[in-house]
Amino acid sequence: MKVAVLQFPGTNCEFDAKYAFTKLGCDVEVIWHKDTKLPENTDLVVVPGGFSYGDYLRSGAIARFANIMEDVKKFATNGGKVLGICNGFQILLEVVLLLGAMKRNDTLHFISKYHTLKVIDNNNDFLRLLNIGDVVNIPVAHHDGNYYIDEVGLKELEANNQ
Protein backbone atom coordinates (compact mmCIF):
# COMPACT_ATOMS: atom_id res chain seq x y z
CA MET A 1 0.00 0.00 0.00
CA LYS A 2 1.31 3.45 -0.96
CA VAL A 3 0.63 6.10 1.71
CA ALA A 4 1.13 9.85 1.28
CA VAL A 5 1.45 11.70 4.60
CA LEU A 6 1.03 15.46 4.27
CA GLN A 7 3.25 17.95 6.09
CA PHE A 8 2.30 21.56 6.85
CA PRO A 9 4.13 24.20 8.87
CA GLY A 10 3.07 23.43 12.44
CA THR A 11 2.01 19.80 12.05
CA ASN A 12 3.85 17.54 14.45
CA CYS A 13 2.58 14.01 13.85
CA GLU A 14 3.62 13.34 10.27
CA PHE A 15 6.64 11.27 11.27
CA ASP A 16 4.61 9.31 13.84
CA ALA A 17 2.17 8.49 11.04
CA LYS A 18 5.04 7.57 8.71
CA TYR A 19 6.51 5.28 11.38
CA ALA A 20 3.17 3.56 12.08
CA PHE A 21 2.35 2.90 8.42
CA THR A 22 5.92 1.78 7.71
CA LYS A 23 5.64 -0.74 10.56
CA LEU A 24 2.51 -2.06 8.81
CA GLY A 25 4.58 -2.68 5.68
CA CYS A 26 3.36 0.33 3.69
CA ASP A 27 5.42 2.40 1.29
CA VAL A 28 5.19 5.87 2.90
CA GLU A 29 6.18 9.26 1.53
CA VAL A 30 5.92 12.57 3.40
CA ILE A 31 4.54 15.27 1.09
CA TRP A 32 5.26 18.97 1.66
CA HIS A 33 2.23 21.29 1.54
CA LYS A 34 3.66 23.32 -1.37
CA ASP A 35 3.78 20.26 -3.63
CA THR A 36 1.00 20.14 -6.20
CA LYS A 37 0.72 16.41 -6.90
CA LEU A 38 0.39 13.30 -4.79
CA PRO A 39 2.77 10.46 -5.67
CA GLU A 40 1.59 8.15 -8.44
CA ASN A 41 -0.37 5.10 -7.27
CA THR A 42 -1.22 6.62 -3.87
CA ASP A 43 -3.71 4.39 -2.02
CA LEU A 44 -4.17 6.49 1.11
CA VAL A 45 -3.60 10.13 2.05
CA VAL A 46 -2.99 10.89 5.72
CA VAL A 47 -3.52 14.45 6.96
CA PRO A 48 -1.73 14.50 10.33
CA GLY A 49 -2.27 16.32 13.59
CA GLY A 50 -0.57 19.30 15.12
CA PHE A 51 -1.23 23.00 14.64
CA SER A 52 -1.06 23.74 10.91
CA TYR A 53 0.03 27.33 10.38
CA GLY A 54 -0.33 27.80 14.15
CA ASP A 55 -4.14 27.47 13.93
CA TYR A 56 -4.18 31.27 14.16
CA LEU A 57 -7.46 31.94 12.37
CA ARG A 58 -9.23 28.65 13.02
CA SER A 59 -7.99 25.08 13.14
CA GLY A 60 -7.17 24.09 9.55
CA ALA A 61 -8.43 27.35 8.01
CA ILE A 62 -5.14 28.33 6.38
CA ALA A 63 -4.01 24.80 5.50
CA ARG A 64 -7.05 24.35 3.28
CA PHE A 65 -5.43 26.75 0.78
CA ALA A 66 -2.18 24.74 0.54
CA ASN A 67 -1.15 23.73 -2.99
CA ILE A 68 -1.40 19.99 -2.28
CA MET A 69 -5.04 20.21 -1.15
CA GLU A 70 -6.36 20.55 -4.71
CA ASP A 71 -4.91 17.17 -5.59
CA VAL A 72 -6.14 15.70 -2.29
CA LYS A 73 -9.68 16.90 -3.11
CA LYS A 74 -9.42 15.35 -6.58
CA PHE A 75 -8.07 12.11 -5.09
CA ALA A 76 -10.94 11.91 -2.57
CA THR A 77 -13.59 12.85 -5.12
CA ASN A 78 -12.38 9.97 -7.30
CA GLY A 79 -12.85 7.50 -4.44
CA GLY A 80 -9.42 7.70 -2.83
CA LYS A 81 -9.16 7.08 0.90
CA VAL A 82 -8.18 10.00 3.14
CA LEU A 83 -7.52 9.81 6.89
CA GLY A 84 -7.58 13.03 8.92
CA ILE A 85 -6.02 12.77 12.37
CA CYS A 86 -6.68 15.57 14.88
CA ASN A 87 -5.82 18.81 13.04
CA GLY A 88 -5.98 16.77 9.83
CA PHE A 89 -9.67 16.09 10.47
CA GLN A 90 -10.17 19.83 11.00
CA ILE A 91 -8.38 20.54 7.71
CA LEU A 92 -10.67 18.08 5.89
CA LEU A 93 -13.68 19.91 7.33
CA GLU A 94 -12.28 23.26 6.16
CA VAL A 95 -11.66 21.97 2.63
CA VAL A 96 -15.23 20.55 2.69
CA LEU A 97 -14.23 16.94 2.13
CA LEU A 98 -16.23 16.20 5.28
CA LEU A 99 -19.55 17.62 6.37
CA GLY A 100 -19.84 19.67 9.54
CA ALA A 101 -17.58 21.98 11.49
CA MET A 102 -15.49 22.09 14.63
CA LYS A 103 -16.30 24.42 17.50
CA ARG A 104 -14.45 25.24 20.69
CA ASN A 105 -14.85 22.73 23.50
CA ASP A 106 -17.86 23.49 25.68
CA THR A 107 -15.51 24.10 28.63
CA LEU A 108 -13.40 26.52 26.54
CA HIS A 109 -10.37 24.63 27.89
CA PHE A 110 -7.87 22.35 26.20
CA ILE A 111 -8.80 18.70 26.76
CA SER A 112 -6.27 15.87 26.93
CA LYS A 113 -7.59 12.46 27.97
CA TYR A 114 -8.53 8.99 26.77
CA HIS A 115 -11.97 8.50 25.29
CA THR A 116 -13.82 5.18 25.07
CA LEU A 117 -15.45 4.28 21.76
CA LYS A 118 -17.62 1.30 20.87
CA VAL A 119 -17.30 -0.22 17.39
CA ILE A 120 -20.74 -0.16 15.77
CA ASP A 121 -19.61 -0.74 12.17
CA ASN A 122 -16.44 -2.43 10.96
CA ASN A 123 -17.17 -2.41 7.24
CA ASN A 124 -14.14 -0.30 6.32
CA ASP A 125 -10.39 -0.70 5.98
CA PHE A 126 -9.62 1.08 9.26
CA LEU A 127 -11.84 -1.03 11.53
CA ARG A 128 -12.13 -4.33 9.67
CA LEU A 129 -9.96 -6.21 12.19
CA LEU A 130 -12.19 -5.17 15.09
CA ASN A 131 -15.48 -6.80 16.00
CA ILE A 132 -18.78 -4.99 16.33
CA GLY A 133 -19.21 -4.29 20.03
CA ASP A 134 -15.46 -4.04 20.73
CA VAL A 135 -14.49 -1.13 22.95
CA VAL A 136 -11.35 0.85 22.18
CA ASN A 137 -9.66 3.64 24.11
CA ILE A 138 -8.18 6.44 22.04
CA PRO A 139 -6.24 9.50 23.19
CA VAL A 140 -7.78 12.88 22.43
CA ALA A 141 -6.10 16.26 22.84
CA HIS A 142 -7.76 19.39 21.47
CA HIS A 143 -9.11 22.86 22.07
CA ASP A 144 -11.48 22.81 19.10
CA GLY A 145 -12.88 19.29 19.38
CA ASN A 146 -16.61 19.94 19.52
CA TYR A 147 -17.83 18.45 16.21
CA TYR A 148 -21.07 19.96 14.93
CA ILE A 149 -23.26 18.86 12.05
CA ASP A 150 -26.83 19.86 11.27
CA GLU A 151 -29.65 17.33 11.06
CA VAL A 152 -29.60 17.15 7.25
CA GLY A 153 -25.86 16.50 7.18
CA LEU A 154 -26.15 13.88 9.92
CA LYS A 155 -28.80 12.01 7.96
CA GLU A 156 -26.52 12.06 4.91
CA LEU A 157 -23.63 10.61 6.93
CA GLU A 158 -25.88 7.91 8.38
CA ALA A 159 -27.28 7.02 4.94
CA ASN A 160 -23.69 6.56 3.68
CA ASN A 161 -22.70 4.47 6.74
CA GLN A 162 -20.21 7.13 7.73
Regions found by a protein language model. Give the residues of each.
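N-terminal beta1-alpha1 cap of cysteine-dependent amidohydrolase-like domains
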Residues: 1-84, 92-99, 103-111, 118, ...
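C-terminal and late-domain segments of enzyme folds
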Residues: 127-162
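Conserved catalytic micro-motifs used in adenylation/nucleotidyl-transfer and phosphoryl/amide-
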Residues: 116-128
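Short loop segments at secondary-structure junctions
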Residues: 96, 120-123, 143
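Residues that flank catalytic or metal-binding motifs in active/ligand-binding sites
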Residues: 87, 113, 134-135
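Short hydrophobic/aromatic residue motifs in ordered secondary structure
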Residues: 89-90, 145
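Short, flexible active-site-adjacent loop segments at beta-strand->alpha-helix junctions, enriched
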Residues: 88-89, 123
